[in-house]
Amino acid sequence: MPVLHNRISNDALKAKMLAESEPRTTISFYKYFHIADPKATRDALYQLFTALNVFGRVYLAHEGINAQISVPASNVETFRAQLYAFDPALEGLRLNIALDDDGKSFWVLRMKVRDRIVADGIDDPHFDASNVGEYLQAAEVNAMLDDPDALFIDMRNHYEYEVGHFENALEIPADTFREQLPKAVEMMQAHKDKKIVMYCTGGIRCEKASAWMKHNGFNKVWHIEGGIIEYARKAREQGLPVRFIGKNFVFDERMGERISDEIIAHCHQCGAPCDSHTNCKNDGCHLLFIQCPVCAEKYKGCCSEICCEESALPPEEQRRRRAGRENGNKIFNKSRGRLNTTLGIPDPTE
């Protein structure tokens, strides 16, 4: 029976990937469709992806598939053909090709079965996830941005919004998509007559969010097809003004794609203009935060003097200190409660 999971250490895999000479392409895709047996589908796809030397992160559930992957450039078309042939529901699926990419985004293949491909917290049995808003293409997005009756809603986490967003887009301050959905409904209650345009990185979150808004009585709902990635690509190809400002945060080793030259965020330590996310180098912390080159040198890649001192300790002492310490996914939340207030929309948590 073939091995359907990785058995090599993370460090060894990363070193092997970095030593590769063949170029790679970073691709993301998703599809909401019914998967009767996610476990069997996962195992079959794992073998297919492994045979093509694909790395990345893939989630499967009864509701569909969500993937961010790195594919050897020479295998991209073979991968596309085999994916399309795998299931009729995947035929012709849009593959979002990364914009600012050296292909070194992943070094291991992780494929997991989950309850949902995006954790949404929705337990309403009457919710129809297929009743989504209308798609918008790049030119239509730009037209909507100039429409005074249109509101752009950013369905990404606060740390994604902080480094880049569409002009005048509203932030739904939250750490997770699950937290954002009810907030978006509450914040928009007084604006049901407006045109609601939702967007996210690659389309998966805003597609479901558009269905959720319609489920809650909003009738004028759109979402950007392919998210920020596809919008920026098409706008550039068509010679259109790119109206997204700053950097598009991505969930891989790159942590961001440069969309425009503007730097709209600031170092969380000194306040200098900066939009480069990093994880604290202290293995007992790993806080996600924005750090400029000067502070990176000053704090040796750590988020504080305390972490800097701890990371300099002998490995055994570091392990002793980490023992029993809760060290989950920590994020520096500078923007919670801070909103675009041009509409006087209150934060419902205040």
From Swiss-Prot:
The name this protein carries in UniProt is: tRNA uridine(34) hydroxylase
Q: Which Pfam families match?
A: Rhodanese, Rhodanese_C, UPF0176_N
Enzyme's top EC category: oxidoreductase
Instruction: Please tell me the species this chain comes from.
Output: Escherichia coli O139:H28 (strain E24377A / ETEC)
Q: Name the Gene Ontology biological process terms.
A: tRNA modification
CDD domains attached to this UniProt entry:
RHOD_YceA
User: Which SMART domains does the annotation name?
Assistant: RHOD (SM00450)
Organism classification, top ranks?
A: Bacteria, Pseudomonadati, Pseudomonadota, Gammaproteobacteria, Enterobacterales
- What catalytic reaction does the record list? uridine(34) in tRNA + AH2 + O2 = 5-hydroxyuridine(34) in tRNA + A + H2O
